[in-house]
Amino acid sequence: MEEEGLECPNSSSEKRYFPESLDSSDGDEEEVLACEDLELNPFDGLPYSSRYYKLLKEREDLPIWKEKYSFMENLLQNQIVIVSGDAKCGKSAQVPQWCAEYCLSIHYQHGGVICTQVHKQTVVQLALRVADEMDVNIGHEVGYVIPFENCCTNETILRYCTDDMLQREMMSNPFLGSYGVIILDDIHERSIATDVLLGLLKDVLLARPELKLIINSSPHLISKLNSYYGNVPVIEVKNKHPVEVVYLSEAQKDSFESILRLIFEIHHSGEKGDIVVFLACEQDIEKVCETVYQGSNLNPDLGELVVVPLYPKEKCSLFKPLDETEKRCQVYQRRVVLTTSSGEFLIWSNSVRFVIDVGVERRKVYNPRIRANSLVMQPISQSQAEIRKQILGSSSSGKFFCLYTEEFASKDMTPLKPAEMQEANLTSMVLFMKRIDIAGLGHCDFMNRPAPESLMQALEDLDYLAALDNDGNLSEFGIIMSEFPLDPQLSKSILASCEFDCVDEVLTIAAMVTAPNCFSHVPHGAEEAALTCWKTFLHPEGDHFTLISIYKAYQDTTLNSSSEYCVEKWCRDYFLNCSALRMADVIRAELLEIIKRIELPYAEPAFGSKENTLNIKKALLSGYFMQIARDVDGSGNYLMLTHKQVAQLHPLSGYSITKKMPEWVLFHKFSISENNYIRITSEISPELFMQLVPQYYFSNLPPSESKDILQQVVDHLSPVSTMNKEQQMCETCPETEQRCTLQ
């Protein structure tokens, strides 16, 4: 948590002083006396500004405000307090401020306040909003911490952070002694990090009786929390507003036409208000966006129809109220927001009067048997539908259009959103739990216990990556791997790059695959132009090398440009995502700092030489030897080495563009879906694979033609040592099973 990151927005090392009151002109004494009558801010000792009082009136109108006295009483008398409230009741901004007041009242003797969020965008926006409401500087009294960006000082009283950042802080500060109050917000999202924190904090609370834990949740999860934590006080915030809910009378196969018809009917009705549409996946956003855009000017007398696509998985802006300049615009604008699941947190505007919900989502569900995500279409939960309805906020005339029947809502939708821990790859979580065990906190009482099969797969993968010793504890490799805020496979590749003298290049690859997609969404009709631009960066050795080429071109442009505008224009011209490349730059700098901090060797860059290319592939194989595929028929049908799934190269792969399909590839991602694409692929040779793959992993591979080919490679490389290798495999396999127990 102490790493340096990006500079804080609007932060300044200078304090605010009252205007002209300290001048040496005549009448100074009267002005200073007048200032003495002003109410002082207890957090920085300066007089409150007029804006503070304006915002205070807005805060007092929030539904949560009437519960302040009850909350403060319960905070004084209890170690755990649960706050139950709807999305727009104000709990995420007000409860942390009240906790800061509590810590101030006891002179911070137990520490400050930290409040977790699931999403990065809300962390930053809440910190900015709360600093404004408290009349203090962002980055000083109030700050935030998100991956690769730290906007706090040692004097920060109230911190907002993502849940995974607080989890990482526990590696070095397991009992979180810097904080007197910990707030877990939006736990109904059921992210892995939040569920882990809920379990670990039970032990921390026992070790630190003075610590306070506040849990903010939607009402749907309260009964489960009560059974999990026992008899703890619950502050219920009432925020009921009449909303007209409209269901379909009968099920429809295709919701696309219904969505478009509803959007244009609402617009033609003349009723004022913005529209939010929840779609199943990002491809649907692009499809609806294009169609609505084409029909947005059919009737200009009704005002402009502005399409706003919001992609929750990318670093996109929040949907906020119009500023004063936009409000004064003569032409009425109706905004149509298109988003997907988890897009609820991006909607911060009270101008929404209509919500259209398709009722289904495309979810990633991890299959530990084949080590791959499946993209499945599933109904959303009843709690998700309720949260979407709450976007209408205080609107007395809001309408919630459900593109499904009432029977579907009651029978097909589950009451609660599934916990991510039960549907995701747990390898990173298990690595963290093993690291915490070193710090003395190995037990974790999960609210929903993960599937034993998922835990076994995670332990097995860590064992293959040499992250565990013979007793099942973290090895030296494992301890160093846990220092990187990356997937364990990527961390292992970085460690291997130190051995193979290609740290500079592998850090670039790690940053590029961790940042959002560097390729922009291409407008309809510009596909050929985009492909032509992207071809300039293609590297013959594969997509990992192409990512290095793109990053280096971005770096050169940044160094040689006179302004940010020139860099942004260059990105637009080449259909590249400028914010994603900026983020990759920040991530790379952070990873380099970790390399230096733990004193790992760092070789000078040598990108382009044959030796360097081979070394990069060795480093990648050291982490991703479990993600190998072979073209079985010469036409681009790739069979996974670990199972019998067949996949194709992604259309944006350099090999797809050049139509040159290598026989063996290493890939970064694979998801089972309609197209079964493998993403970010680079050619490897079977000889190189067999030199680097752990022998006990190879012995556990299922029988296949690919395994037979690799065995022939082994026999050809070292026929004499085959018997010794087989003996080593047999000796290693039993140990592997014994090591794979969560201790």
Curated annotation (Swiss-Prot):
Record field: catalytic activity: ATP + H2O = ADP + phosphate + H(+)
The UniProt record lists the keyword Acetylation: yes
Domain of life from the UniProt record: Eukaryota
This protein's UniProt keywords: Acetylation, ATP-binding, Helicase, Hydrolase, Mitochondrion, Nucleotide-binding, Nucleus
MF (Gene Ontology): ATP binding; ATP hydrolysis activity; helicase activity; RNA binding; RNA helicase activity
Keyword Nucleus: yes
Residues where ATP binds: G85, D86, A87, K88, C89, G90, K91, S92
Result after altering P209R: In a breast cancer sample; somatic mutation
SMART domains associated with the record: HA2
Subcellular location: Nucleus; Mitochondrion
Reported tissue expression: Expressed in lymphoid tissues (at protein level). Expressed in brain, heart, skeletal muscle, colon, thymus, spleen, kidney, liver, small intestine, placenta, lung, lymphoid tissues and blood leukocytes.
Family membership noted in the UniProt record: Belongs to the DEAD box helicase family. DEAH subfamily.
Protein name stated in the entry: Putative pre-mRNA-splicing factor ATP-dependent RNA helicase DHX32
Naturally occurring in which organism (per UniProt): Homo sapiens (Human)
